Amino acid sequence: MALPWCLKTGVLTSPAAGFNHPSDSGFAVPTKLLSIRKGDRERLRIQAVFSFPPRNGGAEKRKQLKHELVEAIEPLERGATASPDDQLLIDQLARKVEAVNPTKEPLKSDLINGKWELIYTTSAAILQAKKPRFLRSLTNYQCINMDTLKVQRMETWPFYNSVTGDLTPLNSKTVAVKLQVFKILGFIPVKAPDGTARGELEITYVDEELRISRGKGNLLFILKMFDPTYRIPL
């Protein structure tokens, strides 16, 4: 039977033959092949030490990449103060996280559902960076319920504006978004103009803590989970 991939053969010593067979398997952990005599027969006993990659190695790498991304985002006020160099750096860090996405079909996963807090975006419409800081939303949320195919975006202080819309899955990663109703100051409903409030969103990374999405025009959205139980009012 063939030796496992993780097994490195050490040195086979045969007293009867009087010579050694060096091994060159290239793996990291040696195996001692000991020859012992019992009665008139010579038996070969293999004492193997196995070495496997750390079971959580992928998770640790993912955790580190996420930490680097979030750490780089923290001083940028969700992207409002990001320079072109900052934007390039965040995009590069985001792509590293996307490359280790543990959820291959995000739209089929329950991880996508709930209330997410926006921590970074390149969307000028959301950032409103040209406005005085006191007129910008303090916090932005995006909510998704795939079972009802609903999406909601909410702002907090000072205006509490929100918008709800419908989702149409295009594949296991991308949805078409059609905004339906805006609420001004949190309670004044305004119907979205026909044909203008449409877009597409690709979910490029999602786990229990973090979600990364991309839209047309090089739009980037990075969000952290706020409330996985949140339901969008119907």
From Swiss-Prot:
Annotated localization: Plastid, Chloroplast thylakoid
Residues of the transit peptide: 1-45
Keywords: Chloroplast, Plastid, Thylakoid, Transit peptide
Keyword Plastid: yes
GO cellular component: chloroplast; chloroplast thylakoid membrane
Keyword Chloroplast: yes
InterPro entries xref list: PAP, PAP/fibrillin_dom
Family: Belongs to the PAP/fibrillin family.
Name of the featured protein: Probable plastid-lipid-associated protein 5, chloroplastic
Organism ancestry: Eukaryota, Viridiplantae, Streptophyta, Embryophyta, Tracheophyta
Gene: PAP5
